[in-house]
């Protein structure tokens, strides 16, 4: 069947092995991200939000003095901290995914690899 532009059996077997390896590594990465605690802080440092590496909210801490300033100040600081935690969590997740799939070269003729 090589005349139809299909990869040979050896290449296909290797591709399946790599796919299985990626799947196993992806599960390990998922577990690793679940176990992470990524902190984001407001610009003044008086509000902190922690997310997992999978962006699940874990906890919030607000400085008592911030609460004395009222609802608007507390909401603004909390939002800043949440945005910072989200950006860090997203960057961490993206970086770890690139490490997982980086260097992936299936090299399959006729399959765009």
Curated annotation (Swiss-Prot):
Job description of the protein: Binds to DNA and alters its conformation. May be involved in regulation of gene expression, nucleoid organization and DNA protection.
UniProt keyword annotation of Aminoacyl-tRNA synthetase present: no
Protein name (record): Nucleoid-associated protein Syncc9605_0027
Subunit structure: Homodimer.
Family: Belongs to the YbaB/EbfC family.
Primary location class: cytoplasm
Top-rank taxon, per record: Bacteria
Entry GO terms, CC: bacterial nucleoid; cytosol
UniProt keywords, alphabetically: Cytoplasm, DNA-binding
Subcellular location(s) of the protein: Cytoplasm, Nucleoid
MF-aspect GO terms: DNA binding
